[in-house]
Amino acid sequence: MERWTVRTCVRTSVALLGTAVLSIVPSFQRSASAQDTLPVGYGTLKRDDIVVRFATDQLEIQVLPLAEQVIRLLAPDTYRSLAQLLKTKGRDLADAAQRTGVDRPTLVMVTFFGLLPQARFSPEDVNITSRGRLFRPVGIVPLSPRWSSYQLDAHEQAVAIYLFEEGISFHEGLTVSYQGLANDAWTGVLPTLDRERARVMARASLQPRP
C-alpha cells in the first residue's frame, strides 16, 4: 500500500507540474496543449526513442519534437525536464513568436554535435516537410552559449528551440532536411508512439478516481 501511495504521489506531482507549465508558458503553447487529452505521468519512452538523428561529415544533428502529444509519452522525469525547460524559456519563446507574427508555432529542439574540430553548422538550414509542405524555421531560441559562433569543437554541442509555423503533423510521416540531406526516420517512430499512447491510456484508466 505504501508503494502504491508513493507512486500515486509521484504521478500526481508530474500531472500538477504539467498543469502549472501550461498556465505559465505562452498562450500558443497552452492552446495547443489544452486540446491534448493524453494524461501526464504515465509514459515510459526515452528521448532516444523519438529523436530523429542524422549526420554530415562534420556534424550529427538531432531533432526532438516538443509537441505535448509527443513528450507526454516520455518517462515522467524526462517530461518534467522538458516541461521545466519550456517554462524557463517561456518568455523568450513568446517574444520570438510575437516577432514573427505566429500565434501558435510548432516547437522543436535541435541539437548539433561536433564530430570534428572546427565543425561549422548553419542553423537556418534545418527544415521540415510535413503533408507536402516545406516548413522553414521562423524563429530560434538558443540554449547554448556557443550557438552564435556557428562552430563546434569535436564532441561539443549546441542546442536551440526552433519555432515553425503551425501545420506540422507529428501523427504522420515527415522529413527533416539539412543542406541537401533528408531523413524520414520519423515514419518509423510512429508505431512506437501509437503503441505507447495506447499503453498510457490503459495505465491511466487503472488508477482509482479521486
Predicted region positions:
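N-terminal secretory signal peptides that target proteins for export/translocation
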Residues: 1-9
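A residue-level detector for conformationally permissive "hinge/kink" positions
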Residues: 10-12, 26, 124
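Bacterial N-terminal signal peptides
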Residues: 13-25
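Conserved functional micro-motifs across diverse proteins
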Residues: 32-210
